[in-house]
């Protein structure tokens, strides 16, 4: 089996290269929408199993990180027709950039995420690895993407405000988790909030995760915990293999 992934680089994403790893006996074919290539359209996406958007670096003023109405319609059509959307965020979330400006919030009808909070989770004792910002997850809800997974590490992670419908929490923070807000560097308790959710949109599927560094970090990335198996499960589920 070959999984075909297209990685968007045309919206100032932090993740500029999809991880190179072994997916058992299966193969990964990865192509890119380069920085100056866009805009995203349906014809560009339709032959791929998964569209990956890795941590858009939102700005208040610039246009390069925003999604146009036509791009949104193309992504909706792609997912609605059976495509997979894999969206990751990170510390700082959507930088409080509103939906009307074209931030990643515009994808909410597919992802179920209305807001990516502007800051970083600081986990409580026994729920982080080495540093409070390296979220250590040992309790995951049952789902095909968590099958066989006992431990996931998510560095530099934000959390979500989600819609009430058609979205399912897969990973949440501990009851004593804090959040460091980027706007003023204040830290306050947030309790149990979602940091990984899945959703289905017509014939397609979406996975949204509040961390991107778990895909690229040297010390707390794919080699940490069961992160490689977790990524493998995500790819297979988004491709309707599980």
Regions found by a protein language model. Give the residues of each.
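Extracellular ligand-binding/catalytic regions of CAZymes and related secreted enzymes
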Residues: 1-9, 13-15, 35, 43, ...
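An acidic, glycine-rich "communication" segment
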Residues: 1-2, 10, 92-185
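Helical hinge/lid and interdomain linker segments adjacent to catalytic or ligand-binding clefts
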Residues: 3-6, 10, 14-105, 110
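Short, Lys/Arg-enriched charge-dense amphipathic segments
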Residues: 17-20, 24, 37, 55-62, ...
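Conserved beta-strand segments of alpha/beta enzyme cores
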Residues: 29-31, 114, 168-169, 205
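Short C-terminal domain-edge/linker segments immediately following a structured domain
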Residues: 34-38, 82-86, 117-121, 236-242
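Hydrophobic/aromatic beta-strand patches that form the interior of the parallel beta-sheet core
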Residues: 86, 170-173, 207-209
């Amino acid at each position: 089996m070959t999984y075909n992934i297209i990685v968007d680089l045309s919206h100032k994403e932090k993740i500029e290269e999809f991880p190179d790893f072994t997916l058992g006996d299966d193969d990964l074919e990865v192509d890119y929408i380069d920085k100056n290539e866009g805009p995203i359209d349906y014809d560009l996406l339709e032959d791929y199993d998964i569209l990956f958007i890795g941590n858009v670096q939102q700005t208040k003023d610039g246009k390069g990180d925003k999604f146009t109405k036509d791009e949104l319609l193309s992504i909706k059509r792609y997912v609605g027709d059976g495509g997979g959307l894999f969206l990751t965020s990170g510390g700082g979330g959507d930088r409080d950039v509103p939906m009307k400006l074209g931030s990643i919030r515009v994808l909410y009808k597919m992802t179920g995420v209305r807001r990516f909070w502007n800051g970083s989770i600081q986990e409580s004792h026994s729920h982080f690895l080495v540093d409070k910002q390296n979220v250590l997850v040992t309790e995951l809800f049952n789902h095909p993407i968590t099958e066989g997974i006992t431990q996931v590490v998510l560095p530099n992670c934000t959390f979500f405000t989600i819609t009430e419908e058609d979205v399912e929490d897969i990973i949440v923070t501990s009851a004593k988790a804090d959040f460091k807000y980027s706007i003023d560097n204040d830290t306050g308790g947030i309790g149990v909030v979602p940091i990984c959710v899945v959703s289905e949109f017509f014939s397609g599927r979406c996975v949204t995760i509040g961390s991107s560094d778990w895909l690229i970090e040297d010390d707390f990335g794919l080699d940490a915990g069961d992160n490689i198996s977790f990524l493998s499960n995500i790819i297979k589920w988004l491709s309707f293999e599980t």
